[in-house]
Structures are given as C-alpha cells and as structure tokens.
Swiss-Prot record:
Region (PBC-B): 123-225
Location of the protein in the cell: Nucleus
Function: Transcription factor which acts with the selector homeodomain proteins altering the regulation of downstream target genes such as wingless (wg), teashirt (tsh) and decapentaplegic (dpp), thus affecting segmental identity.
Name of the featured protein: Homeobox protein extradenticle
UniProt DNA-binding region: 226-288
UniProt key word Transcription regulation: yes
Family: Belongs to the TALE/PBX homeobox family.
Keywords for the protein's UniProt record, in alphabetical order: Developmental protein, DNA-binding, Homeobox, Nucleus, Transcription, Transcription regulation
Amino acid sequence: MEDPNRMMGGHGGLMPPNYGMPTNDGQAGVDNDPRKQDIGEILQQIMNITDQSLDEAQARKHTLNCHRMKPVLFAVLCEIKEKTVLSLRNTQEEEPPDPQLMRLDNMLIAEGVAGPEKGGGADFLSQSDLTGGQDNAIEHSDYRAKLAQIRQIYHQELEKYEQACSEFTTHVMNLLREQSRTRPITPKEIERMVQIIHRKFSSIQMQLKQSTCEAVMILRSRFLDARRKRRNFSKQASEILNEYFYSHLSNPYPSEEAKEELARKCGITVSQVSNWFGNKRIRYKKNIGKAQEEANLYAAKKAAGASPYSMGGPPSGAATPMMSPAPAQDSMGYSLGSGGYDQQQPYDGSMGYDQLHQDLSP
C-alpha cells in the first residue's frame, strides 16, 4: 500500500507543497508585478508635485494630456465623482442681498457720495440757511468741498476693491477651467465658487461703505449742525450789545424796535439779540462782581465821548446801580436770593451759559 504522504508530496499529487502558506517566492512575484510598480511610481510622483518647478509641472501636464489613457482616466474620475460628491441641484440659486449693505447704499446715494455726482448733502438746507449771509456761504462751500473729497476717496477705494475682486475671481476661474481638463469640474461648480469669492469680498465692501457713512455723518455734525449752535459774534457786535446793556441797566429789556435796530447794526438776527440779552442778564446776576468792573469800563467810555453805537438810553451822567456797591436788592427789581430772573419777562434758564465774556449766539 502506498504511503499517503508520499502520494501528496509527489509531482502527481492533488495539492502542491506548502499549499496555502505564504512563501518568499510568492512575495517576490508580487513585487515584480509591473502594474504594482507603475501605481507606486505614480503615487510617488503625485507626492512630489509640490517640489516641482513650474517648467517641470507644465511638461508633466502636457505629457498627461497627450497620454492615450487620459480619456479613460477622466471617465473613471467622473464615475467616482457621481458616486461621492453631493449634488448641487438643490442648492440655492441666488442669496438675497444683505439688508445692511442696502441701507448703506441708500444712505450713500442720499448724501451724494454714491451714484451720479450732485449737490448731495446740502439739499436739505432751507433757502433761509443758504441766504443767511457770507458766513453761511463759506461754511456750505467748505462742506461741499469736504464732501467732494470723501466722494473721491470712496470711489478710488471702491475701484481698487472691484479691481482686486475681479482679478482674483478671474484667476480662480482660469485655474478651475484648466483643472477641468484633468478632473471633472462643472460650470455650475465654477459659478458657485465665484459666489463664494464674492461673499468673502463683500465684507471688505461693507467696511468701506460703513467707514464712508461714518465720515459723512461726522462732516454733517461738524459743518451743518453747527449752524444751530452758538457762534462767536464779531468784536463790533459785542461792543454794541454790551454798551446798550450797561446803558440801560435799570431796565435791560430792549423793545422789539430796539432789537431790530441792534440786529441791523450787529448783522445778526432778532432772535440772536433776544437770546444774547437773556444770557447776559443771567451772567450779570451770577457774576455781579465782574459785571461791576465791566460796567465801570463802559461807563468810562461813555464819559469820554458818545459812542457811535449808542441807542439813545439814559443820559450818561445818570447814576445807575452799577456805579455804586451792589445793594442786596438789585436794580432789576428782584432779590438776588430768589430763583426768578424777571417777573415781567421770564427767561428760560436752560439756555443760559456761565462764562462771562463769551458773547455767543445759541
């Protein structure tokens, strides 16, 4: 009877020696497989792409595009992408505009910074303000010059922004179109990438427009809103008003006719004259000591000679309460300790100012 082991080990046996066990010969066969070597070499070349020079990369790209297996490779990549990449069909076609950006655009258009150049910013001025004298004309001219400067800077920066955005977008689109020759990139994906780039750049546009709006608001506050505030009177106007006040100290309430005459001589409005006298009476009460010195100064001027600004008040020789030490009860008919300023013509104390020599309009 034949030995079973000898039968299995013979060349005519059913199973070869070392069946199912790894051998060095088998490993060597795998290593010597040309296809495995090609794949490994390709992977190594892919890893070394970042180290290549531009000329080397262009040469290899040309070689790949001319390779006879290039269409097959592209078809395989398309098949893989169909299975793995999310579909863009359900993505939103276009996002709604940013409401904050729309508000900034509307403000810039209203102020004449954006859109066609116009007088913008000064349109809300009333005709009375525009004809309010040489000072107003100079102020409005200065405002328009500053606004034109802001407009120029804004358009220069906006042009730089649009140029940078356009250049970067064009560069990315060209890059994606070039890559689409090797890997599948649809026009829809390129359009989506352009939208992403524009959203990134919109933050720069937002900052530019916000800074411009802030500059316009500061300019409005400085030049246009200033006309509602107090302005320095000329030295001549201060002399006229002070002389009338101290020469009528017994009753420093000019009539409407006197106010009109004072306004004409000083080149100011009747309302400014009224406010000046109200503030002057308050300052006189609060600074009675300093007012005494100022009154003596104007009395000396009147004694030296009649002033061309005189409104025909009491005679220069008439004694006034300011010519002697101030009594407990002042010459205007009210107690210094009382809260009222005048029983006949009350004045809103909220408009008063504490500084003595600051002759300003409201």
